[in-house]
Amino acid sequence: SEGRLRCAHVLGIMGDGAGYDTLADTVANTAAFDSENIDSYFPCVTWLDSYIIALGRTRDRRATPIILEKLAALSSDEGGGYSSHCRAVCEALEQLGDPAAAQPLAQLLERCGGAADVVTELKSVNGSSRGRNGVRNLIIARVLYRCGDWENRGRAALSAYASDLRGVYARHAKAVLERQPGEATRPEGWLGL
């Protein structure tokens, strides 16, 4: 029911797994990503994105295969809406920290260009340097590293971003690399994006 889903959603966002079954069923049985942005409730996400995030925040690793199905549906050329879907899947997988997600994340990172958007020379700065791809790929690399890395692909991308001229990217990558692969990249109980 709608009420049960709303309660499970709120509990999941708060890190409570009591509504896991309802969230898992909803995410698993939603065939495609939606496009309605729910800005007034949660910034720059759709309802499915928010359910995926809530499912990950339950920290119940039974959710991993369900979320990996959504990851498989992502395409690097999907366009503007892709960013929120990718961020939601990554947020959920980061909360779970399941090594089973490492290889699919490495494949997603490769499909999205890996560290191709790293800016190491001023002459390479252009309008696309300010796009979402660099942030998206940095997030994918961080989550891949959090899930234990796969063939050191997360470390390689993060190492490249550690040399990025955009200071916030470099500092972020360096902070992640201070930890070991598989080690939580955020404090216990963290609920932010």
Predicted stretch roles:
Residues 1, 16-37, 60-75, 98-125, ...:
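Amphipathic alpha-helical scaffolding segments comprising HEAT/armadillo-like alpha-solenoid repeats
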Residues 2-17, 25, 36-60, 77-98, ...:
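Structural detector for internal amphipathic alpha-helices that build alpha-solenoid repeat scaffolds
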